[in-house]
């Protein structure tokens, strides 16, 4: 329940620009968000594994 409230709070325009912070667009996670994609590392990993992120593939060496 708290997460839903925080996601709704995040969607609103902040009173001051410095109060804005990044959240994952898919799951709402506030930590480890990749700014370029706007999603967290966990969602990024899942989407990259499925091949849904263009130009990205899992590294293996």
Curated annotation (Swiss-Prot):
Transmembrane segments: none annotated. Binds 1 zinc ion per subunit. The keyword Oxidoreductase does not apply. GO terms for molecular function: rRNA binding; structural constituent of ribosome; zinc ion binding. GO terms for biological process: translation. Keywords: Metal-binding, Ribonucleoprotein, Ribosomal protein, RNA-binding, rRNA-binding, Zinc. SUPFAM superfamilies: Glucocorticoid receptor-like (DNA-binding domain). GO terms for cellular component: cytoplasm; small ribosomal subunit. Its cofactor is Zn(2+). Zn(2+) binds at residues 24, 27, 40, 43. Part of the 30S ribosomal subunit. Contacts proteins S3 and S10. Belongs to the universal ribosomal protein uS14 family. Zinc-binding uS14 subfamily. Binds 16S rRNA, required for the assembly of 30S particles and may also be responsible for determining the conformation of the 16S rRNA at the A site. This is Small ribosomal subunit protein uS14. It comes from Clostridium kluyveri (strain ATCC 8527 / DSM 555 / NBRC 12016 / NCIMB 10680 / K1). The lineage of its organism: Bacteria, Bacillati, Bacillota, Clostridia, Eubacteriales. The gene is rpsZ.
């Amino acid at each position: 329940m708290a997460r839903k409230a925080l996601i709704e709070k995040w969607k609103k325009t902040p009173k001051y620009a410095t109060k804005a912070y990044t959240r994952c667009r898919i799951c709402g996670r506030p930590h480890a968000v990749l700014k370029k994609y706007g999603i967290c590392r966990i969602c990024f990993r899942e989407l990259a594994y499925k091949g849904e992120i263009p130009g990205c593939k899992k590294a293996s060496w």
